[in-house]
Amino acid sequence: MAYISLEHVVKRYKMGEVTITAVDDITFDIDKGEFVIIVGPSGAGKTTVLNILGGMDACDEGTILVDGKEISKCNSRQLTTYRRYDIGFVFQFYNLIQNLTALENVELAAQICKNPLPAEEVLRHVGLGERLNNFPAQLSGGEQQRVAI
């Protein structure tokens, strides 16, 4: 069984009289540990698919399973819990709090986790042990992204 499974997923956006189909009957599976790249032209629905998988939007039709949990049937409150505890999402523009250190940014995020790991240990694990007390402006883009992850 796939870790992530999308079956016949459809997403439409309605704006007044106009309906735009952003995702039209897509089906694919991703196994646990598999590395996947989603590519396509502008407007193909890549961001919409990721927003649905990340629990930030819902599909209009179809079934989405993540680790056996059918997120396509989740209500708003359940999606919030899913986003908070079950999935990680790092945006292209990850907004770290600029007046907090790398360590403080991770400690802040850990406050909403069920079983957070020690922030200092996590940062050391991703190669930022010497940068704990640096502010985002003092970190490279890649280092900032590791803090966000």
Where is each model-derived feature located?
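ABC family nucleotide-binding domain
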Residues: A2-I149
